[in-house]
Amino acid sequence: EWETSVLDSLNRLEYYKETQWQECNEQTADRFSAVAFAFGQMLSDSLQVPIGLILNAVGGSPTEAWIDRKTLEFDFPDILTNWLQNDFIQDWVRQRAFLNIKKSSNKLQRHPYEPCYLYEAGIRPLKQFPIKGIIWYQGESNAHNMEGHEKLFRLLTESWRNNWQEELPFYYVQLSSIDRPSWTWFRNSQRKLMDIIPNSGMAVSSDKGDSLDVHPRYKREIGERLARWALNKTYQQNIIPSGPLFRTVTFKNGAAYVTFDYGAGMHTSDNNPIRTFEIAEYDGLFTPAQAEIIDNQTIKVSNK
């Protein structure tokens, strides 16, 4: 439960403390995002220029909190209605917010998880700065509603691009491999968004996740994967931005042939045959399948 003084400041949009640019050193980096630090360090080392990073992430916050009100009113008005009882918003988000504002007698009490709040408190004030691009590592609080997130994430990028540039680079992290059944489908949904949102890129994190912890300890690798997207797409560096990403599948002689972007030279990390592929026929039932790499960038999958 938050104190009255904190609740009052939230109603004045005074959630973030005033700050200033700080040089990166052992003390300032200790309080900063490890993923963002690794991202910035790789960019600075590669480009040989200083990189300025602004961190205003809020743990557990849902995507809708970061979108401007006009956009939500026009494109997703239902999510604005009575948000603490709104089923569009994840149960945990609403429960945490309700607990935080329990001491408030203000029927219009605001909270950082409220739709639009973090945009108003943390994004709109940055409009005066020439932002070069965005890295985004949130989404857990929207994983309960894959279809809703697909729409909200598109609205998020449009909302922020209205502040800066039409195709502001937007690089995001795919959710990791914690043991939650719905996250597999959510990760695939995030992958598809790359083909919908222009000038975007996705860093895979499932191989660096933790089955029990939503905050896995492998930060540097994730930050550097984001940096590869920025170096390739924003700074036009000759660097492969990603590991293999699904592109097409064709069917021939009882087998599926899967092609990938960034798949040249594809091989397994232990040089053993590919494992864990499954295939389904018309009945929709998946069974273990044989998979092999052919021509270094295509995988043949069959149940023979």
Specify the residue positions occupied by each region the protein language model found.
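Cell-envelope and extracellular/periplasmic
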Residues: E1-K304
